[in-house]
């Protein structure tokens, strides 16, 4: 471990004003580093004075590679911090810039599903499960209806279950209906639309329904791992990363009016396509192999992350700095 001197980290990510708000992982990463008293550097001419390079936008690898070699700096990649690192092809999510990703020193991922995705993409660089240790309740979500703790959002106890519902503004009413039909289950509705709900639009407070804004990155890893099920209400949100995280954690997926998009979904998890009505969704939830509605006492779904994998991200950075850099 290095000394307690202030770390200087070069953060390589795409700074495009029209994309502000799309990459909450980048925003969270900046907040996290600052909370650990890390100095963030973004000017390329100052790379020499930095301790390590964090590569978020993969296509910027060519801009930092030369300086990393010249000044003997390690490059740690965080590929899931930028949606621009991926593209969709025939309903599958494809990783771009694989060649550059295989030339960095370390790749940090947040979930086992992300790790499996990289392995399937033929990424051979050493991979580390490196959790951002800052809890959910310390993250700022200005559009949430209310500020709740991490446990209230995604916590699972022996007598309750939580179901993550992915949808857009128009499908929020379905989530409300589901919450009314299953009062003993906590529903977390994640709004993935571009036009978000306003506080005044929600006229009824449902105790077991929470509202959150965000794309994939807003689903804190332990949220997927500890959920009883993931319900996808929008056909265009068949995000393979979310699916892989659910598969890795043995969490069933319920998809509304969505055709088969890949054999890996069928092979890896309990996947059911259902009709669009709230009643149909409710009945399909009861049909899952592990029933999150009636089987509330079951612990089979609680795929918890092992303590020895809960590495603090800042310590991963420090350990990489003191390790000798090998030529690639």
Model-inferred region functions:
Residues 90-107:
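Membrane-proximal helix-turn-helix segments that form the acceptor-binding/catalytic region
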Residues 103-126:
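A short, active-site helix/loop in glycosyltransferases that binds the activated sugar's phosphate group
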Residues 157-173, 188:
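Conserved donor-binding/catalytic core segment of Leloir-type glycosyltransferases
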Residues 198-216:
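Nucleotide-activated donor-binding/catalytic signature segment of Leloir-type glycosyltransferases, i.e.
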Residues 234-236:
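Aromatic "clamp/platform" in nucleotide-sugar-dependent glycosyltransferases that forms part
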Residues 252-255:
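Short hydrophobic beta-strand element within catalytic cores of glycosyltransferases
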Residues 270-279, 287-292:
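Conserved acidic donor-binding segment of nucleotide-sugar-dependent glycosyltransferases
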Residues 284-291, 304-328:
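C-terminal alpha-helical cap of glycosyltransferases
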């Amino acid at each position: 471990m290095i000394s307690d001197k202030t770390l200087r980290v070069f953060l390589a990510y795409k700074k495009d004003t029209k994309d502000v708000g799309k990459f909450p992982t980048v925003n969270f990463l900046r907040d996290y580093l600052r909370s650990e008293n890390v100095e963030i550097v973004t000017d390329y001419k100052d790379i020499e004075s930095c301790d390590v390079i964090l590569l978020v936008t993969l296509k910027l690898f060519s801009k930092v590679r030369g300086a990393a070699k010249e000044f003997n700096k390690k490059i740690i990649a965080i590929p899931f911090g930028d949606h621009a690192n991926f593209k969709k092809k025939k309903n599958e999510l494809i990783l771009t810039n694989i060649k550059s990703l295989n030339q960095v020193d370390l790749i940090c991922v947040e979930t086992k599903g992300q790790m499996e995705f990289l392995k399937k993409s033929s990424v051979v660089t050493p991979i580390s499960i490196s959790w951002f240790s800052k809890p959910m309740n310390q993250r700022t979500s200005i559009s949430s209806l209310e500020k709740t703790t991490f446990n209230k959002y995604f916590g699972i106890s022996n007598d309750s279950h939580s179901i993550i519902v992915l949808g857009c503004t128009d499908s929020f009413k379905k989530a409300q209906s589901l919450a009314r039909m299953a009062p003993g289950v906590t529903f977390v509705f994640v709004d993935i639309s571009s036009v978000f709900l306003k506080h005044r639009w929600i006229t009824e407070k449902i105790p077991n329904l929470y509202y959150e804004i965000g794309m994939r990155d807003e689903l804190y890893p332990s949220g997927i791992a500890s959920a009883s099920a993931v319900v996808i209400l929008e056909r265009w949100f068949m995000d393979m990363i979310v699916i892989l995280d659910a598969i890795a954690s043995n969490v069933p997926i319920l998809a509304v009016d969505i055709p088969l998009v890949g054999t890996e979904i069928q092979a890896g998890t309990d996947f059911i396509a259902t009709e669009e009505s709230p009643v149909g969704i409710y009945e399909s939830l009861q049909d899952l192999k592990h029933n999150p509605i009636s089987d509330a006492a079951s612990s089979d779904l609680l795929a918890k992350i092992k303590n020895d994998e809960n590495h603090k991200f800042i310590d991963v950075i420090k350990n990489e700095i003191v390790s000798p850099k090998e030529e690639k």
